[in-house]
Amino acid sequence: MRSSLAPGIWLLRAFSRDSWYRGLILLLTFLIYTCYHMSRKPISIVKSQLHQNCSELERPDNNSNSTTWCYWAPFDQDNYSQLLGGVDDAFLIAYAVGMFISGIFGERLPLRYYLFAGMLLSGIFTSLFGLGYYWNIHQLWYYVLVQIFNGLAQTTGWPSVVTCIGNWFGKGKRGFIMGIWNSHTSVGNILGSLIAGIWVDSAWGLSFIVPGVVIAVMGLISFFFLVEYPEDVNCTPPQHHSWCLESSDEGVLWHYLHCPFIFLQGVMEFSLCLLFAKLVSYTFLFWLPLYIVNVAHFGSKEAGDLSTLFDVGGIIGGILAGIISDYTNGRATTCCVMLIVAAPLLFLYNSVGQNGISSSIVMLIICGALVNGPYALITTAVSADLGTHKSLRGNAKALSTVTAIIDGTGSIGAALGPLLAGLISPTGWNNVFYMLISSDVLACLFLSRLVYKEIQVLELEGLLGHSILGAPPNPTFCVNHSLPLGAAGEPETNL
């Protein structure tokens, strides 16, 4: 008598060959960018160790300096906040500048080779920062130079993984899929914090070396297993533009095809919004553990562990933003609402968040969700929507450039945030939070035009009783042959 089909084989047969490959790509790109973010996080955990309160520690008998013996030069000066901010900005400015160039290379080079080289270099430069501990290096230029090269190497990651995802997944439920997928940012931050926290008090060099080795190994795995296009393994390519009207007016398409990507409708607004949203997110990324140490008076490891709750909230916020934007067809509106709600809650966290461990946990999770939700949505679903725009005529490689433009502009904010925090924090942490609140409000204002258009479309759909042609999440992205060109060369609409 034959036995029934083995459960494992039944599971394998339950999904198509295309589904298994898509699952592999989703998992692999998730792990790839998790490693990128994991390798960025240790500096925020180690900051409190580079300049700590020596009076709370037991001083060695052979050390006569009772006030600065535990500092790590060159961060033993009174302007240590500015020096640490400068180290952050060396990475972030290089990242912002390199991001605009990275998209161009990403279009022309095989993503598998490009990612492998970038991850290997990122691992080397991350480890070199930690080796400064073992080599007893106390020159500021060394750490700044390592951060610059690391920032340039890290620009290989984001355009590549978003392009790969865009090649494999269509627009259906893109916000939900990418909301889950984009949790790699927060998962990487959490892992980076926990790994760095293991050695921060004993040998902080390992806080950098271990993540550096991990990202290099992951680069090797991506070299062997990453598939850039579904066609490379005889899988069915996704349908990106089934929702869009087929245009008979070649003039409209020709106009868009020959315009710089920055003038594609929505790119400018979302880029500027991301600039301020990322300013807030990266200020928390690089300065939250030190804020907790200074205000709540936790140890370095405890502050690092507590700061991971902000990223836990980021995972929740990214998924919620994706689900809501898919359901409402309103990417811009979803982002704007979350940003506006985040502003007063940031003020509340600074005011009462450190009164007790319970209030701190709750506020960190909520603030993390509201701050990182819009950031996650813009850098994933919105970038993919714009990069697979109908006017690009299926040019999937353009997705790398569009993604680089949006994330590169956002990275300018990522560089400004930690720099401003380093300059402002000596005047009081309250002023830092006022800066963050103002940035959230400005981010929302840049989306106001798109929000207005989305609301008009929703009202029109309500009058008609159905969705307008299965409209995309932002209907202004779609080229409609019935819309004449305006004075600026853009399709006019009376919506």
Describe these PLM feature segments:
Residues 125, 139-156, 357-388:
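Hydrophobic core of transmembrane alpha-helices in multi-pass small-molecule transporters
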Residues 107-119, 326-340:
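Cytoplasmic membrane-interface "Motif A"-like loop-to-helix N-cap segments
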Residues 45-81, 286-302, 384-388:
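Short amphipathic helix-loop junctions that connect adjacent transmembrane helices
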Residues 144-187:
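Cytoplasmic helix-loop-helix junction between adjacent transmembrane helices
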Residues 120-137, 340-354:
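C-terminal ends and interior cores of transmembrane alpha-helices
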Residues 43-45, 264-315, 319, 375-380, ...:
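Extracytoplasmic gate region of multi-pass secondary transporters
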Residues 181-233:
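Helix-loop-helix hairpin linking two adjacent transmembrane segments in secondary transporters
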Residues 1-38, 43-44, 52, 56-75:
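Cytosolic juxtamembrane N-terminal segment immediately preceding the first transmembrane helix
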